[in-house]
Amino acid sequence: MTKTNTLLPEVKRDVLKNVLKTLENKFYKPELLGATWQDAVSTHRGSIEDAPTTDAFESEVSNLLQTLKTSHLGFFHGDARRASSRAALSATYLLTDTGTHGQRWVFQDVHEGGAAATARIKPGDILLAVDGRDIAPPEHPVFPMGKTSELVVVGSDSAKRTVSVTVARPKGKKLQYVEPTLVIAKTPALNIGYLKVAMFPGMVGVDIANAMSAAIRDLGAIKGLIVDLRGNTGGGAGSLRLMSLLTDGKIPVGFAADKKWAEKDLSGLKGSFPRFDSIPEKSQFLWLLALRFLPTLITKSPVVLETEGLGAKPYHGRVVLLVNRHTASAAEMVTIFAKENHLATIVGEPTAGRLLSATSAKVGHGFRLALPTGAYYTWNGTALEGSPIEPDYLEEFAWEERRDGVDAQLAKAIELLNV
């Protein structure tokens, strides 16, 4: 299916009906589907059913979903081969007044191993155009998967340059993204380790958990640790390993509760919820995990994440987390866990405030709806959706300094650990 194909009227009506039914059955917060939502559906129905192309249909349905003002909502066709900068290039950006070039998107996080980094795009570079089209806010750039795009950017020398960015095809249909280098470890200063985690792929996260543990072992007997979660937009339960590396014991982290549990006294019930407290070392043991949690799948009980009890580390008590406006979902789970349990000092910008459990569902004719199915609560009862986590030390992204190679946020982290 091409993006310019027209859809039969009955197809559009059927897909919209399925979208609304799926939201009614699975959406985590049913109170948001009341009169205001029904009015929005009535208002948008005409433009959705009159959408002339597949691309326009996706856009109109997405406009309707945006009225719910909730993260983790999305609508796309399974054959779609275009994605955002974050998903396609492994890079994030922010709106900035650049002076000479006006209001533009400026790259903030550029993950190693991603398409943007391979094309030598750097944090602080200004995006001017994509494939011959001028791109400026509020329009967001999108990139075709499995193809090469030509980007015009401005770097630290203030000169325009054209770079070719080749985006790999995604691994599956459910989530359109390309993995960057997931874990990077180094020693930026004497006795200080640095661990950057770009994302937490996988539902259980066996591979990412092993990679983080190996990186910590390779850092050796460090006396302080910087964990860089800037630009980490989340993932799965592999984040539990990172939390476990911040403390020696077993500490309850939190849980996600779907709409079935929304009206219940979770503070009184949470002690009875089953606990996920160990990531298997090998994927071949995942079936044992599935067997263990089979009753939970039947009862749909929330599952409490609990740290794995990995023992004392030489850097415990001297940890700094680097976060920014793009730190979201499972990465925010790590951040609030460290903050509430006084396991790390948080440096950088307020996080995204997007922390829900989510899934995607087929809604007919090749389309899928991504939607949040549960609210996440920390063990202390904090719900983060819509509430960014404030850093202990605010250090804003300074784009002009950053493109000159000065990372003030990292420098602040090193300063705190050297005290």
Description of each model-found segment:
Residues 390-419:
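Low-complexity, Gly/Ser/Thr/Pro-rich intrinsically disordered linker/tail segments
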